[in-house]
Amino acid sequence: MFDFFKKTAQNISNFLGGGAKQQIEKELLEEVLIEADVDYEVIEQLLQHLPQNITRNQLEVGLDRFFRGESYYDKVSLKDIPTKPLVELIIGVNGAGKTTTIAKLAKRYKDSGKKVLLGAGDTFRAAAIDQLKLWSEKISVDIISTQYGSDPSALAYDTINAGSARKMDHIIIDTAGRLHNQTNLKNELLKITRVCSKALNNEPYRKILILDGTQGSSSINQAKIFHEMLKVDGVILTKLDGTSKGGAILSIIHALKLPIIAIGVGERAEDLLDFDQKDFINKLLDSIFEVK
């Protein structure tokens, strides 16, 4: 899964030098984790009960304890929504990869035999509407769109009604990532969430935040703003094939207490992978202790 980790691993290899390591001094390991863009508060939490010279097994224990301490799979999980259609509102700043991620989700659902409808809800960017239309044609799923500058809440309402009438399994709705100021964006997004609830007769739906993985830990502040505003249900990290900041996943989990649903590792519609905690831990350990 975590082949994207090769850039993070290469960065660590350049830092440590080649050759497998039996153990690493705690101070050096701190520097390695900082190099991988792990937040210092998280590093302290990971290493606080470990000895001065740390083996792979000992760091694995620390990472396991971190995930348990964050209640990552005990309390923090993506809520199951049995109602149909399942509506997912896609949120995030422009440039984070929202439109491409929508296409990847849609293809995943379609390939599993589900009926999918897209909603081009970023009506303040003509390019966003056009891009989502192109993706809908490429992966052969239906789309509801409107003219540039139209009311995005009305588009969301129409998309949900159309999806219900057409017996769709999944509805995925794009949203704006930037308006003239943050207050306008907040008001617009809150309005869309109210309209979605109304169209669904107050049945639950998902709000998924898209974060640019190349931004690493610096994306956390914007994520907190969206989460405080909308109570996000989960996160998808994009562009992780092109970054050496793979360790930021730990920082994001710690800061947001939200499940990471999937990771984007390329531009193709197939390049969306489920996040797997154990695979992530193993690849991080490999990049530190099995340096090529």
Curated annotation (Swiss-Prot):
Q: Which GO terms describe its cellular component?
A: cytoplasm; plasma membrane
Signal peptide (UniProt feature, chain positions): none
Q: What EC number(s) does its UniProt record assign?
A: 3.6.5.4
Q: Name one Pfam family in it.
A: SRP54
Binding residues for GTP: 92-99, 174-178, 238-241
Say yes or no: keyword Cytoplasm present: yes
What is the protein's membrane topology class? Answer: Peripheral membrane protein
Give the top-rank taxon of the lineage listed in the UniProt record for this protein.
Bacteria
- State the compartments where it is located: Cell inner membrane; Cytoplasm
Q: Which GO MF terms are attached to this record?
A: ATP hydrolysis activity; GTP binding; GTPase activity; signal recognition particle binding
Q: Does the keyword Transmembrane helix apply?
A: no
Query: Any idea which UniProt keywords this protein has?
Result: Cell inner membrane, Cell membrane, Cytoplasm, GTP-binding, Hydrolase, Membrane, Nucleotide-binding, Receptor
Q: What reaction is this protein's catalytic activity? A: GTP + H2O = GDP + phosphate + H(+)
**GO biological process per UniProt:** SRP-dependent cotranslational protein targeting to membrane
Q: Which InterPro entries does the protein's record reference?
A: AAA+_ATPase, P-loop_NTPase, SR_rcpt_FtsY, SRP/SRP_N, SRP54_GTPase_dom, SRP54_N_sf
Q: What is its main location?
A: membrane
Q: Would you identify the family this protein belongs to, as annotated?
A: Belongs to the GTP-binding SRP family. FtsY subfamily.
Q: How does it assemble?
A: Part of the signal recognition particle protein translocation system, which is composed of SRP and FtsY. SRP is a ribonucleoprotein composed of Ffh and a 4.5S RNA molecule.
Q: What does this protein do?
A: Involved in targeting and insertion of nascent membrane proteins into the cytoplasmic membrane. Acts as a receptor for the complex formed by the signal recognition particle (SRP) and the ribosome-nascent chain (RNC). Interaction with SRP-RNC leads to the transfer of the RNC complex to the Sec translocase for insertion into the membrane, the hydrolysis of GTP by both Ffh and FtsY, and the dissociation of the SRP-FtsY complex into the individual components.
Q: What is this protein called?
A: Signal recognition particle receptor FtsY
